[in-house]
């Protein structure tokens, strides 16, 4: 930064009045509800999202041996991000491997990793490559395509299959509609309840950056969105800060896949 100017709120009286300034600076029940994730040091608390402390806890949990089903969570993009985990089938999960895959070789590399790890269930992002997921589903019978929705209910996800919900399905085959905010909230809660671990050697700066990138922002009632003591917080929504959150999404898909092994009769093996 070569040049800069210091601007105070009172320098723009036609944009923000003194009364509004007082409201916005004092009318927050939680100071972390006054959000600016792009400039300066952010006011954060435990409700704002995952922190490096949470990552350390996940590493400690990951030291405990875990056997069970293998599940995949895949986030698509020019560079695809894959999380491989062991699921106990009873609510616990440990991340054992992570991979980055060039989209140009995704199909061959994914099939190779399936032969190595033999996942019971795979949940993959569908955007922006829905045709890729459809093609992969022809070869991989336990691959579910994930679609984010913004629902008002408490249900984190719902499986839609062609036979039962043909009019609601975007894919012709297996699809999982994920209630985005609710699912990320539950993922964070499970991490803090020591249900999700990171095995030795999995954690690095990239994973830490991705898991701590997104933060929760409160949607609430009140004057111009200010959260006062009398206002009621309706819900949180997860927002990007720097945009490096791909492994966080892959972990969520893996978390959903682990729940599919608990509630559905999915045969082992990927092919």
Describe every region a protein language model picked out:
Residues 226-242:
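Short, solvent-exposed helix-loop connector elements
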Residues 41, 45, 49-51, 55-57, ...:
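Mg2+-dependent endonuclease catalytic cores in nucleic-acid-processing enzymes, primarily RNase H-like
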Residues 231-233, 248, 253-271:
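Acidic two-metal-ion nuclease catalytic site recognized across multiple nuclease folds
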Residues 1-71:
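ATPase catalytic-site recognition across NTP-hydrolyzing enzymes
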Residues 62-91, 250:
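Gly/Thr-rich phosphate-binding beta-strand-loop-beta motif of the actin/hexokinase/Hsp70
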Residues 36-41, 185, 189, 248-259:
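Short, hydrophobic/amphipathic alpha-helical patches that form generic packing surfaces
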Residues 242-243, 256:
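Amphipathic alpha-helical/coiled-coil segments positioned at domain termini
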């Amino acid at each position: 930064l070569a040049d800069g100017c210091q601007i105070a709120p009172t320098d723009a009286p036609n944009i923000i009045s003194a009364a509004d300034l007082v409201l916005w600076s004092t009318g927050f029940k939680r100071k972390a509800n006054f959000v600016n994730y792009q400039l300066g040091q952010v006011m954060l608390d435990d409700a704002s999202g995952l922190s490096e402390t949470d990552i350390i806890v996940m590493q400690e949990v990951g030291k405990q041996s875990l056997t069970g089903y293998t599940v995949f969570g895949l986030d698509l993009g020019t560079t695809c991000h894959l999380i491989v985990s062991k699921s106990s089938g009873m609510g616990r999960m440990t991340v054992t491997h992570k991979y980055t895959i060039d989209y140009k070789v995704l199909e061959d590399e994914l099939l190779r990793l399936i032969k190595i790890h033999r996942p019971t269930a795979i949940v993959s992002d569908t955007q922006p490559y829905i045709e890729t997921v459809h093609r992969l589903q022809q070869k991989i019978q336990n691959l579910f395509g994930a679609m984010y929705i913004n629902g008002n209910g408490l249900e984190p996800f719902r499986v839609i299959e062609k036979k039962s919900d043909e009019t609601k399905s975007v894919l012709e085959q297996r699809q999982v509609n994920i209630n985005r905010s609710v699912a990320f909230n539950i993922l964070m809660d499970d991490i803090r309840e020591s249900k999700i671990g990171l095995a030795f050697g999995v954690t690095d700066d990239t994973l830490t950056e991705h898991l701590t990138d997104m933060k929760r922002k409160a949607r609430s009632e009140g004057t111009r969105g200010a959260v006062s003591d009398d206002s009621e917080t309706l819900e949180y929504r997860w927002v990007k800060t720097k945009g490096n959150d791909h492994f966080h999404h892959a972990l969520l898909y893996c978390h959903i896949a682990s729940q599919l092994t608990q509630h559905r009769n999915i045969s082992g093996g990927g092919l």
